[in-house]
Amino acid sequence: MSAEVDTNIPKENVPEEVVEAKTTTTTTTMEPEPLIVEDLKSTTIESTPVKIGDPTSNEQIAREEPKPTITEPSTTKSVAAEPTTEQHQETAVKLESVKEADAEAAARVESTEDADGEKALSTSQPSVSFDKTTKTHDGSPLSKFFSELPEILKVAGHNEMWGIILDPSEDHVQTSIVLEKFLRANTKDVTKAKAQLTEALKWRKAMQPQKLLVDTEFDKVKFGKLGYVTSYPTSEGGKEVITWNIYGAVKDTKKTFSDVPEFLRWRAALMELSIRELDLASATEKIPENGPDPYRMIQVHDYLNVSFLRMDPGIRAASKETIQTFSMAYPELLKEKFFVNVPMVMGWVFTAMKIFLSADTIKKFHPLSYGSDLGAEIPGIAEKLPKEYGGKGEELESGFTVKYSGDDVPKSD
């Protein structure tokens, strides 16, 4: 997972004002000549408002400057008389006076432009305050989500997500990463993202997954060699983080999966270890609003020698709970997910996932019949992968894992 106020305030389309000049008639009536005054803007002139296009404004101008006499049009057809040279001169003088008044009004418009802009802003874009330390949002989904954050934190009673203390200030990079991920998981629907974030924060408050990673020692017999985290440098200067679940390492399915809450705690601790490798808490770049998300990981589930997943109800319950909880608590952290050495009887797993995950997430899933095919799917780091996954790198046991009681398996940093 910064917005600025839009100062491009729309201005009123001011129509051209037509001032008709007519001479005073004696025995004949002169046809009126249109005098065009162009591009006049609405303005406020000192204590008396004068607005072009407003009848009262024209009267104000008339009081200040001489104006041609306006006569009511006759109901009968008039015969136009050829204006005299004196009449032309009189009309020109009056037109010049009107132009001078218009120039003065235009100068006053220029001098009050900033004040008028601020007034228009206050009426067309009402500000929304988060608190004393935050900025007015710009109307984008992310900015609106920021405006909801204080209420979310109050309702949840918790302000930590993935090692990040959430901050309502829109310039807080790490918070923007979290919010953007929850938005993308909900197709930019702020209301849905707000509900999910609130639920995720409540879950973290109860589960305390970071403490599970740091303080808890898990049962080696139940979970030993079941999960690892590896990190490989890329040619672009970044790194590819992979979480591995080696289900073939399970020796006693009932011990490992029968206690679903215990399995979920172990799995959450492993997930927190993966997130730590992503360095979200120290990130300095926001996720581009409509660009690729660089803060994601790869997951690999290996089912080599697994022949017990089709019917065992305990395993199904653990899998269902994990999928449902993680889709809520860890949205948009998955770049791709590979299921390797998948037997045909594992079809029910993919069916279960479709119930809780979005179509876009399902597209990230890639079942592979053989583990050695994995390297071809991740060519950028293929050679760094363990041999059984198509590479030439170190074994998984050299990677990171959670703490286990009474053994010397690799520990998390």
From Swiss-Prot:
<keyword id="KW-0349">Heme</keyword>
<feature type="binding site">
    <location>
        <position position="301"/>
    </location>
    <ligand>
        <name>heme</name>
    </ligand>
</feature>
<keyword id="KW-0408">Iron</keyword>
<dbReference type="GO" id="GO:0005829">
    <property type="term" value="C:cytosol"/>
</dbReference>
<feature type="compositionally biased region" description="Polar residues">
    <location>
        <begin position="121"/>
        <end position="131"/>
    </location>
</feature>
<protein>
    <recommendedName>
        <fullName>Phosphatidylinositol transfer protein sfh5</fullName>
    </recommendedName>
</protein>
<feature type="domain" description="CRAL-TRIO">
    <location>
        <begin position="222"/>
        <end position="397"/>
    </location>
</feature>
<dbReference type="Pfam" id="PF00650">
    <property type="entry name" value="CRAL_TRIO"/>
</dbReference>
<comment type="similarity">
    <text>Belongs to the SFH5 family.</text>
</comment>
<dbReference type="GO" id="GO:0043001">
    <property type="term" value="P:Golgi to plasma membrane protein transport"/>
</dbReference>
<dbReference type="InterPro" id="IPR011074">
    <property type="entry name" value="CRAL/TRIO_N_dom"/>
</dbReference>
<dbReference type="Pfam" id="PF03765">
    <property type="entry name" value="CRAL_TRIO_N"/>
</dbReference>
<comment type="function">
    <text>Non-classical phosphatidylinositol (PtdIns) transfer protein (PITP), which exhibits PtdIns-binding/transfer activity in the absence of detectable PtdCho-binding/transfer activity. Regulates PtdIns(4,5)P2 homeostasis at the plasma membrane. Heme-binding protein that may play a role in organic oxidant-induced stress responses.</text>
</comment>
<dbReference type="GO" id="GO:0005886">
    <property type="term" value="C:plasma membrane"/>
</dbReference>
<dbReference type="GO" id="GO:0005789">
    <property type="term" value="C:endoplasmic reticulum membrane"/>
</dbReference>
<dbReference type="GO" id="GO:0032541">
    <property type="term" value="C:cortical endoplasmic reticulum"/>
</dbReference>
<feature type="region of interest" description="Disordered">
    <location>
        <begin position="1"/>
        <end position="141"/>
    </location>
</feature>
<keyword id="KW-0963">Cytoplasm</keyword>
<feature type="compositionally biased region" description="Basic and acidic residues">
    <location>
        <begin position="85"/>
        <end position="111"/>
    </location>
</feature>
<keyword id="KW-0472">Membrane</keyword>
<dbReference type="InterPro" id="IPR036865">
    <property type="entry name" value="CRAL-TRIO_dom_sf"/>
</dbReference>
<feature type="binding site">
    <location>
        <position position="247"/>
    </location>
    <ligand>
        <name>heme</name>
    </ligand>
</feature>
<keyword id="KW-0813">Transport</keyword>
<dbReference type="InterPro" id="IPR001251">
    <property type="entry name" value="CRAL-TRIO_dom"/>
</dbReference>
<dbReference type="InterPro" id="IPR036273">
    <property type="entry name" value="CRAL/TRIO_N_dom_sf"/>
</dbReference>
<dbReference type="GO" id="GO:0017157">
    <property type="term" value="P:regulation of exocytosis"/>
</dbReference>
<keyword id="KW-0445">Lipid transport</keyword>
<dbReference type="InterPro" id="IPR042938">
    <property type="entry name" value="Sfh5"/>
</dbReference>
<keyword id="KW-0479">Metal-binding</keyword>
<feature type="binding site" description="proximal binding residue">
    <location>
        <position position="303"/>
    </location>
    <ligand>
        <name>heme</name>
    </ligand>
</feature>
<dbReference type="GO" id="GO:0046872">
    <property type="term" value="F:metal ion binding"/>
</dbReference>
<keyword id="KW-0256">Endoplasmic reticulum</keyword>
<feature type="binding site">
    <location>
        <position position="337"/>
    </location>
    <ligand>
        <name>heme</name>
    </ligand>
</feature>
<dbReference type="GO" id="GO:0008526">
    <property type="term" value="F:phosphatidylinositol transfer activity"/>
</dbReference>
<feature type="binding site">
    <location>
        <position position="267"/>
    </location>
    <ligand>
        <name>heme</name>
    </ligand>
</feature>
<keyword id="KW-0492">Microsome</keyword>
